[in-house]
Amino acid sequence: MSRIGKLPIKIVDSVKVDIKDNIVTVEGKRGKLSQELKSSIKVRVEDSNIIVERSFDDKQTRAFHGLYRSLISNMVKGVSDGFSKSLTISGIGYRVEQQGTSLFFNLGYSTQFEYVIPEGINIRLDGNTKIAVEGIDKCRVGQVAAEIRGLRVPEPYKGKGIKYDNEVIRRKVGKSGVKK
């Protein structure tokens, strides 16, 4: 049995779970998410817990068992608490500003980057060097944060670029002078 898949998912009081035709819908105070399941995975609600089970025991179904359990768990956490990722911009003249539903980045290039904020994602700016990406879908929050980071990945010599708050940049030593 999958070690992750066999664990029950606790349902918070403010969350409502609906299962119809292999589609799990989770609704909470922050919004509504749904996930379509493979036919080999079955889900049931029992005593304020969600139980994920599989009908076959082949390798792929065992992998999907743990995957869908994690996805449903993230849906429950997302609609009740939400997810957040923080990014920091470091470098001389590097900054970000928000205009409507777009972010404009000055990252040391000759042109300014425009990033359109997708639906269902909230962006908070703290000054012009800190970005907080928030939303109910963990996958989309991580994807948006990765796309923003990808605009200027931190370089290893001075650490300039966009990095996650908890990320440690491996630094390299620069060129040493000519020895005589």
Curated annotation (Swiss-Prot):
GO cellular component, one term: cytosolic large ribosomal subunit
Listed GO MF terms: rRNA binding; structural constituent of ribosome
PROSITE patterns: RIBOSOMAL_L6_1
Biological process, per Gene Ontology: cytoplasmic translation
Annotated keywords: Ribonucleoprotein, Ribosomal protein, RNA-binding, rRNA-binding
Residues annotated as transmembrane: none
Top-level taxonomic group: Bacteria
Gene3D superfamilies given in the database record: Ribosomal protein L6, alpha-beta domain
Quaternary organization: Part of the 50S ribosomal subunit.
Function in brief: This protein binds to the 23S rRNA, and is important in its secondary structure. It is located near the subunit interface in the base of the L7/L12 stalk, and near the tRNA binding site of the peptidyltransferase center.
HAMAP family on file: Ribosomal_uL6_B (MF_01365_B)
Family as reported in the entry's similarity comment: Belongs to the universal ribosomal protein uL6 family.
Name of the protein in question: Large ribosomal subunit protein uL6
Protein species of origin: Borrelia turicatae (strain 91E135)
